[in-house]
Amino acid sequence: MTDHALLLVNLGSPASTSVADVRRYLNQFLMDPYVIDLPWPVRRLLVSLILIKRPEQSAHAYASIWWDEGSPLVVLTRRLQAAMVEHWPHGPVEIAMRYGEPALPDVLERLAAQGVRKVTLAPLYPQFADSTVTTVVELAKQTIAERKLPLQTRILQPFYDHPDYIQALAASARPYLEQQYDHLLLSFHGLPERHLKKLDPSGNHDFQAADCCKDASAEMRAVCYRGQCLATAKAFAQKMGIPDGKWSVSFQSRLGRAKWIEPYTETRLDELGKAGVKKLLVMCPAFVADCIETLEEIGDRGKEQFIEAGGKELVLVPCLNDHPEWVRVLAGMCENA
């Protein structure tokens, strides 16, 4: 075995569906300053208030989608890891989670102890956000520095418009799109508008523009989450030949009362159901592995909401998971990181 590891990093999951484990996970997640970017005292107070009721609610949601093998997100990421082994001849392939287990700092320390000296760190997020990519990269850097680990790292950059990534999306979704349907909704994870505003030095971010950041500087395009989501959706629709009007974009998983980027997925589900859409396909291209946000929020609650609004059928298109084309594409992108 050589000394160059591939480390696939995803968001994470509670250890179980118990309220205690969910509370512990939510506390770690929400106290990350890249997730709730407020001063520590305010963040601590807000998270403490959230943790009064949210753990029990979330535990019920996790229980509704939990597999015999464990958390779908963790299980699917491990399946991806297993598939990647034959595509990475340079050393071990490991997974880590930003929150929960296996913890990123512990995995880095274990790799160093095994004699690994180079790590290709692959945050499994197609689009850039401080609350996903930056927090992973900064924690890795902090861990290596504080624990004095003899590791060199290279980072897989966001790949939201990489032609091979779009090809992988197309390959995984094609069986669903070849069936009859009325509309395709591409639902991305949402973000508070302030997360984008603080990265835009111009102060002129247009959150309603259909071509968000299209003509902005390369530096701005590299950090504009909304613009990258729109670019992913447009590239995918063009790849699949989906006409304008038959697809749209929305943003899900809003937390709290702050203004988040729009349109909200729950609003679009109502609008589409009331507009006469009967069979709705939903893809979630911000996630590469199915998780509570796809399986429960869209596949269960979203389906119920759409039907109540007048729709007849909502079909959740699976994420990339361990699709062979995605495995091939990810291996190639990591090789060239």
Curated annotation (Swiss-Prot):
Residues bound to Fe cation: 189, 293
Pathway: Porphyrin-containing compound metabolism; protoheme biosynthesis; protoheme from protoporphyrin-IX: step 1/1
GO cellular component, one term: cytoplasm
GO molecular-function term, one example from the UniProt record: ferrochelatase activity
Biological process (GO), any one: heme biosynthetic process
InterPro entries, A to Z: Ferrochelatase (IPR001015), Ferrochelatase_C (IPR033644), Ferrochelatase_N (IPR033659)
Keyword entries, A-Z: Cytoplasm, Heme biosynthesis, Iron, Lyase, Metal-binding, Porphyrin biosynthesis
Entry coiled-coil feature ranges: none
Localisation per UniProt entry: Cytoplasm
Enzyme Commission number(s) of this protein: 4.98.1.1
Family: Belongs to the ferrochelatase family.
Function according to Swiss-Prot or TrEMBL: Catalyzes the ferrous insertion into protoporphyrin IX.
Name assigned to this protein: Ferrochelatase
